[in-house]
């Protein structure tokens, strides 16, 4: 009896490649081709034919129902991913494990952030995740499994990617599209399998592989989004600042002592009427340094497929994230934050014989980071702390003879220092760049030894890990000047008498470098 037909999936009605069609208890069998078609010759007296494929429920059809063989529909197994857990020595059924193990579906990790660890919060039971910065390139979260379990310096969980230990920065840069399985060991099971390194728990990530006899599938995802602060602190304007300052001094002047007004009525009136921004400055430092929002982009492309021998999965991701810092008009270089990531995953496998399989997996991460030389968190702090009316952010070009460089305003600080804080000058004074590269490669051989004893397998694996790092910081000393007097020329122009204060300025961008690998 010759049986012919096509096997399709219940999910999308598309043909399934590589379905095993066989008669149980015999060597009679066939495999569906690239179009899902099969042909099977069975002897007379055969009662049932079985259809089986990984990820689908096995189906049996009675030979007597010949019409049912023309179009066979397999139903996806709803619990196939939840039932399989990746552990130290391979995969096991979840019900066979007695420890606290959680399997995370990769789809739950797909968030708008470019860092995988930021998606942990509130989605994985037992995992504590805290994000202390929103700065692009430095916004990865710190995370612990069931709290901190050791007293040593390293309190982070053990991270395993395709059988090899990795650092948390590499974990942050694994795109969810490349993840096949994500398992978390949360109790003594981790220590039993991985020794003392597993005392803080273990996260095991396995990347996708190709599939034998599968048509090439190409997936593309393009995203563009807007980032902005969730809340901006309200800051008093210069007039309110001066009036409140004077009021605070007045209420704190002891009885019997004469109250001395710090800000004169003339200065308050001039500031309110915006007579001259250099004589009566009113600096909104936050608006000078920060934008309202920024635009970010990312792209992901992956290709998956395979023939009867070789199968493959290739993934490429590009992330481009920007900060919300402005570029001062006087600056000759970019002072905003920019984080670029180029991530590549290449997995190639081959079924050399019926019992021998080889696999090569390579993960490459190229990270580029540009930022102002001043810490961004400090710049934000300075915008809240700096005096808004003591001096202008910058004086007009030409205010100091024979000086073509930017002339930043300043004044002695309230605590006796030679200069105060000028956030605008600190943003403008330099930039830093950092280039980091990670490469992890694993080569494995799996040998089926069923001919020795059923279920026996041997795996051999070698791995290579490399990190290179290079950083450059360049900065100059701003020219700080204090206004001692000014002249109103009567024609709408002014002459300012400026005096250099603090450390002498310099226009030379001095370098500072560092590298390792």
Task: Indicate residue ranges for each PLM-predicted region.
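Short, surface-exposed loop/turn segments at beta-strand-coil junctions that are enriched for proline
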Residues: 45, 448-450
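Small-side-chain secondary-structure face that scaffolds active or pore-lining regions
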Residues: 319-341, 373, 434-440, 451-517
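Extracellular loop and loop/strand-boundary signature of outer-membrane beta-barrel proteins
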Residues: 286-289, 329-334, 347, 426-432, ...
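Short, small/polar-rich motifs associated with maturation and membrane association
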Residues: 1-345, 357-359
């Amino acid at each position: 009896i010759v049986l012919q037909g096509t096997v399709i999936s219940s999910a999308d009605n598309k043909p399934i490649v590589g379905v095993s069609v066989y008669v149980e208890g015999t060597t009679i069998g066939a495999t569906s081709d690239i179009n899902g078609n099969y042909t099977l010759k069975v002897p007379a007296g055969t009662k049932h034919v079985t259809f089986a494929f990984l990820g689908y429920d096995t189906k049996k059809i009675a030979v007597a129902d010949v019409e049912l063989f023309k179009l066979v529909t397999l139903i996806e197994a709803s619990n196939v991913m939840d039932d399989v857990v990746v552990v130290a020595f391979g995969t096991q059924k979840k019900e066979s494990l007695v420890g606290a193990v959680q399997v995370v579906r990769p789809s739950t990790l797909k968030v708008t952030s470019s860092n995988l660890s930021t998606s942990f919060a509130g989605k994985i039971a037992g995992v504590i995740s805290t994000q202390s910065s929103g700065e692009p390139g430095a916004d990865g979260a710190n995370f612990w499994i069931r709290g901190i379990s050791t007293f040593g310096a390293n309190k982070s969980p053990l991270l395993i990617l395709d059988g090899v230990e990795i650092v948390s920065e590499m974990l942050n840069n694994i795109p969810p599209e490349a993840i096949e399985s994500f398992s978390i060991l949360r109790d003594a099971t981790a220590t039993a399998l991985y020794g003392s390194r597993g005392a803080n728990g273990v996260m095991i990530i396995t990347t996708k592989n190709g599939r034998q006899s599968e048509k090439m599938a190409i997936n593309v995802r393009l995203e563009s989004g807007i980032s902005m602060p969730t809340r901006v602190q309200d800051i008093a304007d210069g007039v309110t600042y001066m009036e409140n300052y004077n009021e605070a001094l007045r209420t704190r002047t002891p009885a019997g002592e004469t109250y001395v007004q710090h800000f004169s009525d003339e200065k308050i009136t001039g500031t309110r009427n915006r007579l001259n921004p250099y004589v009566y400055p009113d600096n909104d430092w936050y608006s000078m340094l920060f934008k309202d929002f920024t635009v970010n982009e990312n792209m992901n492309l992956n290709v998956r497929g395979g023939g009867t021998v070789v199968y493959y999965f290739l993934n490429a991701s590009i992330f481009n994230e920007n900060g919300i810092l402005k570029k001062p008009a006087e600056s000759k270089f970019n002072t905003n934050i920019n984080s670029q990531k180029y991530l590549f995953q290449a997995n190639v496998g081959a079924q050399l014989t019926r019992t021998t399989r080889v696999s090569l997996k390579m993960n490459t991460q190229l990270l580029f980071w540009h930022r102002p030389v001043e810490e961004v968190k400090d710049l934000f702090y300075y915008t809240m702390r700096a005096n808004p009316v003591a001096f202008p952010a910058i004086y007009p070009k030409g205010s100091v003879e024979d000086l073509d460089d930017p002339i930043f305003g300043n004044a002695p600080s309230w605590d006796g220092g030679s200069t105060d804080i000028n956030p605008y000058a600190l943003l403008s004074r330099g930039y830093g760049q950092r280039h980091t590269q990670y490469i992890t490669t694993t080569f494995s051989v799996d040998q089926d030894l069923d001919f020795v004893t059923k279920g026996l397998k041997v795996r051999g694996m070698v791995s290579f890990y490399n990190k290179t790092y290079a950083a450059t910081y360049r900065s100059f000393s701003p020219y700080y000047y204090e206004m001692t007097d000014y002249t109103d020329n009567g024609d709408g122009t002014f002459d300012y008498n400026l005096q250099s204060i603090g450390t002498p300025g310099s226009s030379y961008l001095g370098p500072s470098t560092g590298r390792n690998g």
